[in-house]
């Protein structure tokens, strides 16, 4: 059951722009899910995301195994002036389903 996804915002994105200039972020996310009986279980997923500088990205979690609803779990961004680091920001309000993020590196 794949209940996580990485979404990106490509508003005003120039499709002719070269993808080779984008950084790839290698990271693992451990999420906290609830079943119908509210028993928590954990899932760890590995991702590779293509990032653009100065954009905020969001990892979403599924509210429950039976639900189609999603909540924002954690936000991260890569800054144009330092492409070797990623800023991780927990969601300020609401349920935070993100237990842990392991950053393996940016290339």
Q: Whereabouts are the PLM-identified features?
A:
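Generic beta-strand hydrophobic packing signal
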Residues: 22-25, 101-103
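Extracellular jelly-roll beta-sandwich "head" domains, especially the C-terminal globular C1q domain
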Residues: 6-10, 38-43, 56-107
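Surface-exposed ligand/attachment interfaces on beta-rich extracellular proteins
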Residues: 1-23, 32-44
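Short edge-strand/loop segments of extracellular domains
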Residues: 44-53
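A short beta-strand element within beta-rich, extracytoplasmic domains
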Residues: 23-33, 84-91
């Amino acid at each position: 059951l794949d209940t996580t996804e990485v979404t990106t915002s490509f508003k005003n994105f120039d499709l002719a722009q070269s993808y080779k200039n984008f950084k790839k972020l290698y990271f693992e996310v451990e999420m906290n899910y609830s079943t119908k009986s509210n028993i928590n279980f954990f899932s760890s997923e590995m991702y590779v995301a293509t990032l653009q500088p100065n954009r905020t990205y969001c990892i979403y979690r599924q509210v429950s195994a039976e639900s189609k609803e999603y909540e924002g779990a954690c936000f991260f961004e890569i800054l144009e002036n330092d492409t070797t680091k990623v800023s991780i920001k927990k969601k300020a309000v609401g349920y935070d389903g993100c237990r842990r993020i392991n950053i393996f590196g940016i290339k």
